[in-house]
């Protein structure tokens, strides 16, 4: 098994809630996306492309809602993940998006590929087009013209088959491409091959050892990732379903109905471009297929039955399907296989009958209803764009009928992006956003429902309460957007936390490198749990150049009931800075008064302190430091 290049990670700063590829991203915040993307690259590459697998930063620049951003937002937020993956993690491959920036498609955009990427950031890696992106360049009639536009614009490799770049010799002969431009592309590719060891006398291409996949340790990692990513949005006290105080009492929940299209489904467990999802996606037109070679995907029904506490009875009825006629629109542009798929498939087939009458009858006999709803890999992903952000099909109407039984409804929402559920959410006893939780996702959701673990994740997006098709982001204002139901950074727990004793310098020189921040977090409840404390920075005057509020750090803290931990975070002075372009592109750290904020979300700030930056304005081409560091 081996490989020298992975077309990941996708670090688009996704500020449009309806974006069909949001599931692949790290959300709407540039800082968070940069932290996660940089860690991804370091882990994948292992510090040496000859030993690790090369990462590819994509989709450069502004795919997912940032392509129309002004220069300041583009350079401070949208560029940031690509910048840190290149400068801090050594990412040596980059993929431009299909979209346009300032009117020019990214794959042929010299401003972003040559001026910003190479000249400003110093990138010396390889630029590869997204699949067929060069084919789709508008206003150009021939492959020769498209190849000329792309290579002059800064693109090195024509993916997937080089159909346009085969004409580059003709372009050179006709003087349409300068020799130095052609040599740049060739050198970029050769340089990558050398770094990956492909030019060595005996290149290391793959391991000859037996590779064991899907091991016990890997399943545990998958479980940990899932359990730390599931967000509790609402809870009136019904969760956890099993409470220590209620055991052996009349209050103990005994009969649970599990229902909904995602209750017993593999389609909503793994997101787009994960191997199981892609296998099922392309094999689904067959009546039968062999998936015995795939990792076992734990569905919610299986997990709830396998781990149910003594005395609890699980009943199951699907009750509702995603949709009869498939809602997804497949665009003819992009991956041509998806267009072919539209011709082959007209329905998301669950292979299981949905009997609403049966489910509603079971609901009336149950103590609690768990409704597993949302999207699936057929309804969200690249080239799959459905109408609206409400629950697909008649799922909302079905939940209304479940609510009408008078029994408490726990809504578990699966999918790669937020769904507009504001009409029903507040009337549900609890709401869980499970996303695409992976192969151990069913186990993680079940353990949270039963109270074996406490939910701890926070939202990486602003969760909308209405259909939103334009960019929204928490850092546009300190006030919560009226279109947002739950804010960025929000997430409930089965316990409560108190924040206290913030200690930070009150005055700091612009020439200083860093200072430490201290604060304490206490678990004031009765359940062991994790809290994700968040550090934000805000200006105190309207003429300051930084965002009204901006995430600048976070720390996951595990606490037993009654336990207090002191957190120390190193905060770099570069984090007070802002971008400007006054003849030269530069990073500025200006004197002034700023407000440091510690909170449980972007709208739940628990501690504040003003910090005065003194001294002269510091100007540098690029930041020396990007991220705060958790010391303890």
Write out the residue ranges for each language-model feature.
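Glycoside hydrolase catalytic-domain context in secreted enzymes
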Residues: 1-580, 586-598, 602, 625-632
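Short beta-strand elements
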Residues: 604-620
């Amino acid at each position: 098994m081996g490989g020298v290049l992975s077309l990941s990670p996708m670090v688009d700063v996704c500020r449009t809630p309806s974006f069909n590829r949001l599931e692949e991203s790290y959300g709407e915040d540039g800082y968070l996306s940069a932290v996660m993307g940089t860690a991804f690259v370091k882990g994948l590459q292992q510090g040496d492309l000859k030993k690790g697998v090369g990462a590819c930063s994509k989709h450069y620049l502004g795919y997912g809602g940032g392509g129309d951003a002004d220069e300041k937002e583009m350079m401070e937020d949208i560029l940031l993940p690509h910048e840190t993956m290149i400068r801090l993690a050594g990412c040596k491959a980059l993929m431009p998006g299909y979209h346009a920036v300032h009117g020019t498609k990214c794959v042929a955009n010299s401003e972003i590929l040559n001026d910003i990427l190479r000249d400003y950031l110093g990138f010396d890696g390889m630029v590869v087009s997204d699949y067929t992106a060069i084919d789709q360049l508008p206003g150009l009639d021939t492959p020769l013209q498209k190849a000329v536009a792309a290579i002059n614009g800064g693109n090195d490799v024509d993916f997937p088959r080089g159909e346009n770049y085969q004409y580059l010799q003709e372009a050179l002969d006709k003087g349409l491409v300068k020799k130095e431009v052609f040599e740049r592309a060739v050198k970029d590719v050769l340089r990558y091959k050398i770094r990956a060891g492909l030019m060595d006398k005996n290149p290391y291409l793959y391991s000859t050892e037996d590779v064991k996949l899907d091991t016990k340790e890997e399943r545990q990692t998958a479980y940990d990732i899932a359990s730390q990513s599931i967000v509790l949005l609402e809870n009136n006290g019904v969760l956890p379903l099993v409470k220590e105080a209620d055991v052996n009492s009349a209050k103990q929940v005994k009969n649970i109905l599990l229902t909904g299209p995602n209750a017993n489904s593999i389609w909503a467990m793994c997101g787009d471009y994960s191997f199981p999802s892609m296998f099922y996606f392309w094999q689904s037109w067959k009546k039968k297929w062999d998936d015995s070679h795939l990792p076992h995907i734990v569905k919610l029904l299986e997990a709830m039955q396998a781990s149910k506490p003594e005395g609890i009875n699980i009943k199951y009825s699907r009750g509702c399907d995603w949709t009869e006629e498939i809602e997804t629109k497949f665009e003819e542009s992009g991956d041509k296989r998806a267009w072919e798929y539209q011709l082959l498939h007209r329905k998301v087939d669950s292979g299981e009958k949905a009997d609403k009458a049966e489910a509603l009858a079971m609901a009336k006999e149950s103590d609690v209803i768990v409704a597993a709803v949302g999207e699936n890999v057929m309804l969200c992903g690249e080239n799959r764009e459905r109408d609206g952000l409400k629950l697909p099909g008649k799922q909302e109407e079905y939940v209304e009928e479940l609510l009408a039984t008078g029994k408490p409804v726990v809504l578990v929402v699966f999918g790669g992006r937020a769904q507009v559920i504001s009409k029903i959410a507040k009337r549900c006893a609890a709401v869980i956003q499970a996303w695409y939780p992976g192969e151990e996702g069913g186990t993680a959701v079940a353990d949270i429902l039963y109270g074996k673990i406490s939910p701890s994740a926070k939202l990486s997006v602003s969760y909308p309460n209405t259909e939103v098709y334009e960019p929204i982001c928490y850092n546009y204002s300190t006030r919560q957007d009226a279109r947002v139901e739950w804010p960025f950074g929000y997430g409930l727990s089965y316990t409560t936390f108190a924040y206290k004793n913030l200690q930070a310098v009150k005055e700091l020189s612009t020439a200083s490198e860093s200072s430490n921040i201290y604060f304490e977090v206490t678990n004031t409840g009765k359940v062991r749990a994790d809290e994700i404390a968040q550090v934000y920075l805000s200006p105190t005057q309207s003429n300051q150049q930084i965002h009204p509020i901006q995430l600048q750090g976070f720390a996951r803290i595990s606490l037993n009931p009654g336990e207090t931990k002191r957190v120390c975070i190193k905060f770099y002075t570069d984090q007070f800075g802002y971008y400007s372009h006054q003849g030269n592109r530069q990073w500025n750290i200006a004197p002034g008064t700023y407000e440091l904020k510690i909170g449980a979300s972007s709208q739940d700030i628990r501690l504040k302190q003003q910090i005065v930056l003194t001294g002269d304005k510091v100007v540098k081409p690029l930041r020396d430091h990007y991220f705060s560091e958790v010391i303890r």
